[in-house]
Amino acid sequence: MLPALRLMTCALLTFFTTLSHASQCPDWSHARASSEITALQQQIASWDDSYHRQGLSQIPDELYDQSRQKLNDWRSCFAVSTPQANPLKTATGPLAHPVPHTGVNKLADEKDVKAWLKGRTDLWIQPKVDGVAVTLVYDEGRLVQAISRGDGTQGQDWTPQARLIKAIPQQLPQPDSLILQGELYWRLTDHVQAASGSVNARSKVAGMLARQTISPQQADAIGLFVWDWPDGPADMAQRLAGLQAMGFNHSVAYTHPLENHAQAADWREHWYRNPLPFATDGVIMRQGQRPPAQRWQASAPYWIAAWKHPYAQALAEVRKVHFNIGRTGKIAPVLELTPVRLDDRTVSRISAGSLSRWEKLDIRPGDHIAVSLAGLTIPRLDGVVSRAAERAEMSVPHASDYHESSCWQAAPGCESQFRARLVWLSGKKGLALPGVGPGTWDKLIESGHISGLLDWMTLNHAELANIPGLAERSSDKLLDSLQTARERPFQTWLKAIGLPPAGNAKLPDNWHDLAERSVEQWQAEPGIGPGRAAKLRAFFQDPHVQALSQQLQAQGISGFK
C-alpha cells in the first residue's frame, strides 16, 4: 500500500478556473491576504513537522487535506508565486532509500476520479492502509535494512525495530536480493472504517517505531502490507505472484483488477463499510505498467492516484457569530458558515454550545472549524482547526445581563430574548396560536406595534392591515388567531407567560392565591425542592410578571380577575 503520508504539492490539488476563484476568493487587501496566507502556511508547516518527523498527527488527514487545499486556493486568488515548502523537509534521515518513495495524487471527487481513469489500461486497486511507510532491503533473501519513509529520499534506520516485528520476514524463501516498499500498520480485528474511524492506528505504530526498544507484545501488534516491489517484474500479475510466493499474502488478497469508475466506487465503498484487519483512509488506484525504479522520484507520479474516503469531518469557514438569547436568558452562540457538504447534507449554521464553550474556543469570523454529523444527521462543532491572523472585534453579551427576569420589553439589547418570549407564548407549549410564529412576531415588532409581551392583545383589524407584509386576508386570519388566546385556560396562560416548571403541584385557578404563596408553601408541593420553590416565588413576585397579570386582568382573562 502506498504510504499514508501527506506528500502534497500545489500541482496535486484541484485547480479552479479563474471564474470559480473569483467567486470563492476572500475580499481582502493584499496586506491582509499576505498575513492570512503566512499564518496558514506556518500552521500547516507545524502539522507537517509533527506528522512526518515525530510521527504524531495533530489533525485528521481529511482536515489537513482540506486546509492545504484552502491554502492553495488563497495562493491562487492572490497570485502568490513563491513555491510552497516541502511538507517532508523536516522528516529526512541519515539513510538513503535505494528507490525513492513516491507521493500520491489525491483526487478530490468523482469527477477527478473519472478523469484520471479515462484512457488508462492495466489498472489495479488496493485499500489505502493507514500506517507508516517503510523500505525493506533484502540481500540474498536476508533482511539487511529497514528505512522509514522520511522525506521520500532519505529516512531513519528502523532495522533494529524491524528485527522484532514478526510480520517482517527476516529471511525470504528464496535467496533473492530485492527492495520492497510497504506500510507498517496497527493490527485491528474486524475494523469497520465507516463506524470506527482510524482509532489513532497510525500514531500507535509511529510511536512504537520511535522507541529504541519495543516489547514482543507491541511488535506482534504491528502488521505489514507490501504495496510495491520497485525492482520486481514489469507485469503487475507477475509481481503479485512473486509477492505471494514470498509470503506477502495481503498484497494479493487486497489487490484487484480495475476497469472503470463504477468498480472503483464499489471497492471504495466495500472497504469503507466492511471489516478489515487495518485502518484505511481511502483506496489507491495504480497502473500495472510504470517506469523503471531508477526513474522514480520523491513526488507524486502519474501512474498512481488516491481516492480518499468520504469526509467524516469538513473544514468550514466561520462567516459570522450570532448570540441567540433564549426566553430564560440562556445565551447560545451560533456560527454562520460558508456552506460545506457532509454526506448528503449542506451545513451553513452550527451551534457552538454554551457561551462558556464559545469563550474557551474563542471562535471569530475567519476562523476555520471542524464540523461533523452527530448520529449522521445533526451538525456538530468538533473544534477549531486554524485561526484567522486578523482577529475580528466582537460585541459579546454578558451572561450576567440575561436571566429569567430580564427582557420583558423590546428594549435595546433585549431583541433576542424578548422575541424568544413571544415565540414561546404563541407556540405549542404556550397558547398554541394557529399560524402565529417567529415571522409573525418579527413583522409586529419591526412595525412598532409591539414593545411589551401582551401588546398584541389590543391590536385591531385596521392596525394589522397596515403592517407591511400582511395582506388584508392575512391580517383577518391573524386577528382571529390572536383572539383565540382569550379562550385558553388559566393554567395555559401561566405557562405561556413563563411559569417555571411546577412539577406535579396542584395549582389553584386564580392568580391571587399563587402570588401569595411563600417558598415554604411551594416546597410543600410534591416534586418541588428548595431551588424550584425559590424560582416559583420569584416569578410571582417579579414586578414585570405582576404587570402582565394586571394586563390580563384588564383583558378579562379567566383566573386573573
From Swiss-Prot:
Entry similarity comment: Belongs to the NAD-dependent DNA ligase family. LigB subfamily.
SUPFAM superfamilies (alphabetical): DNA ligase/mRNA capping enzyme, catalytic domain, Nucleic acid-binding proteins, RuvA domain 2-like
The encoding gene: ligB
Reaction it catalyzes: NAD(+) + (deoxyribonucleotide)n-3'-hydroxyl + 5'-phospho-(deoxyribonucleotide)m = (deoxyribonucleotide)n+m + AMP + beta-nicotinamide D-nucleotide
EC number of this enzyme: 6.5.1.2
GO biological process: DNA repair; DNA replication
Transmembrane segments: none
Active site, renumbered: 128 (n6-amp-lysine intermediate)
Free-text function comment from the UniProt entry: Catalyzes the formation of phosphodiester linkages between 5'-phosphoryl and 3'-hydroxyl groups in double-stranded DNA using NAD as a coenzyme and as the energy source for the reaction.
GO molecular function, one term: DNA ligase (NAD+) activity
Keyword DNA damage: yes
Alphabetical list of NCBIfam families matching this protein: PRK08097.1
Originating organism: Pseudomonas syringae pv. tomato (strain ATCC BAA-871 / DC3000)
Keywords from the UniProt entry: DNA damage, DNA repair, DNA replication, Ligase, NAD
Name of the protein in its database record: DNA ligase B
Pfam families linked to this entry: DNA_ligase_aden (PF01653), DNA_ligase_OB (PF03120)
